[in-house]
Amino acid sequence: MKSPLLRTLFASVLTALAAVASAAEPIKVLIIDGRNNHDWVRTTESCKATLEATGRFKVDVSTAPAAFAKPQPAKPKAGDAEGKKAYDEAFKAWKKEESDFNKAHAGDWDKWSPKFSAYAVIVNNYNGPEWGAAMKDAFTDFVVKGGGLVNVHAANNSFTGWDNFNEMICCGWRGATFGQRIAVNDATGKAVAVAEADEKIKTKGFGSGHGPKHAFTLKARDAAHPLMQGIPTEWLHASDELYHRMRGSPDHMEVLESSFSSEKFGGTEMHEPMVWWAKFGEGRVVTTSMGHLWAGDKSFDALHC
């Protein structure tokens, strides 16, 4: 029987982030979703069910305006001149439909304005277009004034050009020229910057990545931290993506758990951060790179175990 340790950790994190809330009242949580290259619908359902099952949380969901859903035309085989001509015409028509849709729904983004201040914790399950200035300011103000924030998996892929968000998450899925490459020093358990010359595995490009999904061991780096209570010092996570070479700054990053990224699974032969937290103003921000789920995936183990 699989042990639901990731769900236990998730609930513990949100409880600790909302420690100032009255013990008699449920902790109010808002999940942000609607755009993501992953299956954000089922990820949100899983997060919501996990929290509500504890009886400690009241969970609401705020979903971004819908994207243009019609898939792009399929590309023809190489050398198929007639197919290429038909594809070009179909793609041109598709682009016009997409443009017309976006124009018709441009005002939807102005109407999307979650009331962050009404909640103790925000769960970020969003990886899509950058928000408008007013929404970004409200989000920043929420965290600065003491709100809790939890970023799930691909949420740390987003908002590359938003300085406040980059400071909140410390490191994320970024290109090779962004910030510093972050790893975990196995001896100290601390986040460290790694120079390209010190990489143990040399590959083309040094931006963020991952190898094939596989099960891997999580190692506690701050077992005494309140967020880690009830979590073993080592535990086996189900098959998931093990992010490596995430980039940003280690300056105020506190690692809670890491995993060894093995070359056997396309990894770096270094310890990579899996769960970490940071202060931002009076708020606390927790980020986990775990929780991969594509649309159509039949296994939810990466979200549960």
Predicted features, each with a name:
Residues 115, 121-124, 128-229:
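A glycine-rich, often tryptophan-bearing local segment used as a flexible ligand/cofactor-contacting loop or short
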Residues 34-37, 127, 204-206, 211-216, ...:
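Active-site rim elements
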